[in-house]
């Protein structure tokens, strides 16, 4: 929180400056306005004190023979090339330069498939002493392994969702991070779907979107899920309470609900909580007395839930933007808030040919979805891929229904195409139910998608994939264990 002694000093400095030099040529200050602005800037910085951005220049070392772990590429002393992150090896000009053009797919300037090591140093601030730290990588293709100061942390994977690496606590001061990104085919899903392929996306290597360290206090909250009920203005909430100490801790949790458009506060509530050691799953129901506005494609009304946990002067604020909307079906009709909706949509096959990867910028997705609306569309099907969170956020604001998917494996992908070699699918993947590798990946990726984007009202449809022609259709049990949106 803002240091009260620092604020007192700032007041004295500003007052002394104005009084000591009333007629000098020094800039004249409006004490109230400047102090207010200064306090606001400090407060905003204080809110961001739990985030440390790692965007900027990194070093990268290619590892085409996958010898980096054996030869300790995670330690210092290895020669690296400079690269700006977020970004890709293609943009930096690393890999094999393409000569001519590739038939039927995007022609990349440079090609590289395999592990690449990204390294840099960073400094942990003193006020992070004893705090739990998580590395957040917004978008990676496909696997990330992390080392801190030569110590292996863990491995994460996923094509359409962020990678979270739990680093534990780090002492204040300088540290070195090494991230091994492997864009090779980790699970055999082939290379013809848009989540992993060269048709409209490329098989890029790098890190996109946010790259940051996130700190949390000893008693913190995580994995917030909201379940709005349009029938009775009720909001069910679930989240994890994490106690990183070795003893039971008492604290306070407050809930505040605001209408984003008007910024009107419509609900506030707080209660004492007891956090046992480890992780506890917590549920809460907020009964909202006043009427709420529903969300749909014509009226994209949004609300912001703020949950703040406080314990012995340490606090953590988490926010979730969501909408009150209900999705049901009546025979052949889809109902949004009990109203039949005709889905007028577009097929999005990851069309970003200038970069070869999807934008993680909200404004860019708002621009795209406003074009949709100008043509009378209200729906987008992301063919065999899942977009970044920016797309869901923009769709929430504009009023677009999203269908996200995982992959595409069809019968012809398991066959060598001698007459059209370019159509031969890498790995010759068998269909789901006959492909243990893909059978493991799909339900895990579906669950990651729900975890990452399930609070967005625009996320109304979830699909395993496209044209699963050689699959065992009993695989629908994949969906039975997934929580409802």
Which positions does each model-derived feature cover?
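Substrate-binding/catalytic cleft of secreted carbohydrate-active enzymes
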Residues: 369-372, 379-485
